[in-house]
Amino acid sequence: MADKGTLYIISAPSGAGKTSLVAALVDKLAQVRISISHTTRAMRPGEKDGVNYHFTDRDCFVRQVEQGRFLEHAQVFGNLYGTSADWVAQTLRTGDDVILEIDWQGATQIRKQLPDSVSIFILPPSLEALAGRLRGRETDDETVIQQRLDGAQEEMSHYGEFDYLVVNDDFQRALYELEAIVEARRLVTARQVARQAATLQNLLARR
């Protein structure tokens, strides 16, 4: 029996620290890979195509939607985002876990298609902290920041649809909680049977 990886859906309002937490989680745990989304959003300073996102134009994105190339896709703040269906399926078959950093709309689509996926919502400790983090980025003007804050409350209203809830008040604590979720899922009997097949066979062999 082959060991198949687990698909993790991680959502959070913009500025909650999701990207930093996921990057730290991948650094700590083996066999965890981040799905790189396709987007029509403009590249920000310091970003690289194929590393942060697969940047594309709207026409190309729409063609891929029509071809069924995306596991999920959504429009956020006027930009289109999508997850490659082929890449996710191939990576899970290798036994690696996959993390999708997507909004609640995409999470809803994924859960319907893949009910075995595990969903996690990350909350900021307060709206004031969220606003401070968004302004601290120094990448958006005040109008955009206000739009993001308005969108954040809509996003956060869907927290109850997720399997796990993590509050990013203390970064290391939040990272520990994410790590605990992944490690616990790896100990589920169905996955352990695949990983520990030789051990189980030896233990239960007639002597």
UniProtKB/Swiss-Prot annotation:
It comes from Alcanivorax borkumensis (strain ATCC 700651 / DSM 11573 / NCIMB 13689 / SK2). Pfam families: Guanylate_kin. It is found in: Cytoplasm. GO terms for cellular component: cytosol. It is an enzyme of class 2 (transferase). The keyword Transferase applies. It catalyses: GMP + ATP = GDP + ADP. Keywords: ATP-binding, Cytoplasm, Kinase, Nucleotide-binding, Transferase. Belongs to the guanylate kinase family. CDD domains: GMPK. Essential for recycling GMP and indirectly, cGMP. ATP binds at A12, P13, S14, G15, A16, G17, K18, T19. Its main location: cytoplasm. It comes from the Bacteria. Its EC number is 2.7.4.8. This is Guanylate kinase. Residues 5-183 form the Guanylate kinase-like domain. One of its GO terms (molecular function) is guanylate kinase activity. SUPFAM superfamilies: P-loop containing nucleoside triphosphate hydrolases (SSF52540).
